[in-house]
């Protein structure tokens, strides 16, 4: 898929909770096709000391408006500066980057699991897969109610569940502690997950033991986005691979994780 450098217009900057923001960017020309799980590298112009672009996951797209949204979590100086941008400002991007999720077949029952800011690609995936809402189960986890990211778009899916570590929203615990996960995992044909490493490894372990198809979106540190700097390399069954170009989505059978 061809990568392009685009100067985009910021049309919306919405704070979703204390450290997560949704930025909506619009292009003057038609955007290239984007796949759930891909990301965008953004230049932080207002901070001259920040040399490298920052990668952000695509939350959703609106081809009719030539726009898409990014989830920006404040993790450092670059992301913090980006959240101060105002609608009307222009942002330099490189897009789309990486390999996204494999689309399910029409008969598949799928489980989408997002932890923390890993919820970013899940709504996009749920919408793009084109399945009946009854075939889609969404399970989102966070530390507390205040850490959960806006879930309005998920309401169309009947099987939509929360977990929080302090029981302030949904069931208490991690996503792997949820009653649906523990009792109905084997009913799904495909599992897709994005979130903290320990969460994804736990999901991968359970999917492996159940013999289920499972893809995870890794969150390795990235710099260039083109597989040149090698800072995001992940060991796989077929050698080292750059997460920014050969991921960030991998089938769990490609990874060398030990359960």
Annotated model-derived regions:
Residues 77-219:
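FNR/FR-type flavoprotein reductase catalytic core
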Residues 1-4, 240-259:
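Short, basic/aromatic-enriched C-terminal tail that caps enzymatic domains
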Residues 48-56, 98-106, 244:
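Short, Lys/Arg- and Gly-enriched loop/turn segments at beta-strand edges
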Residues 121, 197-198, 219-248:
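Local cysteine-cluster metal-coordination motifs and their immediate loop/turn environment
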Residues 12, 60, 162-164, 216, ...:
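Structural signal for conserved beta-strand scaffold positions within catalytic alpha/beta enzyme cores
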Residues 2-87:
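Ferredoxin-reductase
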């Amino acid at each position: 898929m061809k990568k392009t450098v685009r100067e985009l217009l910021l049309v919306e900057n919405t704070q979703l909770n204390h450290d997560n923001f949704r930025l909506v960017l619009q292009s003057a020309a038609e955007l290239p096709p984007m796949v759930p799980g891909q990301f965008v590298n953004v230049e932080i112009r207002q901070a001259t000391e920040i040399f490298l672009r920052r990668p952000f996951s695509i939350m959703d797209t609106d081809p009719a408006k030539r726009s898409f949204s990014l989830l920006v979590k404040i993790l450092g100086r670059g992301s913090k500066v980006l959240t101060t941008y105002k609608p009307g400002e222009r942002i330099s991007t490189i897009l789309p980057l990486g390999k996204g999720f494999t689309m399910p077949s029409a008969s598949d029952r799928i489980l989408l699991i997002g932890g923390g800011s890993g919820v970013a690609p899940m709504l996009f995936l749920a919408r793009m897969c084109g399945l009946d809402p009854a075939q889609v189960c969404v399970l989102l986890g966070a530390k507390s109610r205040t850490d959960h990211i806006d879930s309005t778009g998920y309401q169309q899916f009947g099987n939509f569940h929360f977990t929080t570590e302090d029981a302030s929203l949904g069931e208490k615990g991690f996503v792997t502690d949820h009653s649906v996960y523990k009792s109905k995992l084997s009913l799904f044909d495909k599992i897709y997950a994005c979130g903290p490493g320990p969460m994804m490894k736990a999901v991968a372990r359970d999917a492996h033991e159940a013999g289920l198809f499972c893809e995870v979106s890794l969150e390795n540190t990235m710099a260039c986005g083109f597989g040149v700097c090698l800072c995001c390399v992940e060991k796989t069954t077929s050698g080292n691979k750059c997460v920014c170009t050969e991921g960030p989505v991998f089938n769990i059978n490609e990874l060398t994780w030990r359960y």
